[in-house]
Amino acid sequence: MLAALLVCAMVALTRAANGDTGKEAVMTGSSGKNLTECPTDWKMFNGRCFLFNPLQLHWAHAQISCMKDGANLASIHSLEEYAFVKELTTAGLIPAWIGGSDCHVSTYWFWMDSTSMDFTDWCAAQPDFTLTECCIQINVGVGKCWNDTPCTHLHASVCAKPATVIPEVTPPSIM
């Protein structure tokens, strides 16, 4: 009990010292003492931080914008993660860029963060492998599915990066 209180106090003091009380933090790890957090305005899901950017940008400019925050356009790895991302984009009402592309090798889709493309939610007849359509737009049509579209279109975007792990601090033993 005392250890839990000390950890909570340490977290509160760290946040106050950083002047950043708007961060989203989650206890993780087998000991329950590790803390991961996201910057202010970012939202956490499965150990990653996501940010919806409503600015209408070309895909490459959206990626550059993410990189300025140490992130990439989001990769999506499960239906649950996609549901979370859709909620970030005003419940799926706003078309947005994510980090998938086949611009380098047509028909070979990859994520900008170099993770495997182990989940997709393409709309019917997509991707259609049109050479000028090599970036992924989400929230298309009634099904809110994915479409390969020209990278020069203007859309909002979703960035993602790993959550920051705050090192576990072992409080001094009290004798």
UniProtKB/Swiss-Prot annotation:
Q: Where in the cell is it found?
A: Secreted
**What disulfide bonds does the UniProt entry report for this chain?**
38-49, 66-159, 103-134, 123-145, 135-151
Please list the residues that make up the propeptide. Answer: 17-33
Stored Gene3D superfamilies: Mannose-Binding Protein A, subunit A
Keyword flag Electron transport:
no
Keywords on record: Antifreeze protein, Disulfide bond, Lectin, Secreted, Signal
One of the record's GO molecular function terms = carbohydrate binding
Top-level taxonomic group: Eukaryota
Entry GO CC: extracellular region
Q: Where is the signal peptide?
A: 1-16
- The chain positions of domain C-type lectin read 36-163
The family database entries (CDD domains) matched by this protein are listed as: CLECT (cd00037)
Role, per record: Antifreeze proteins lower the blood freezing point.
Alphabetical list of PANTHER family matching this protein: MANNOSE, PHOSPHOLIPASE, LECTIN RECEPTOR RELATED (PTHR22803)
Specify the protein name.
Type-2 ice-structuring protein
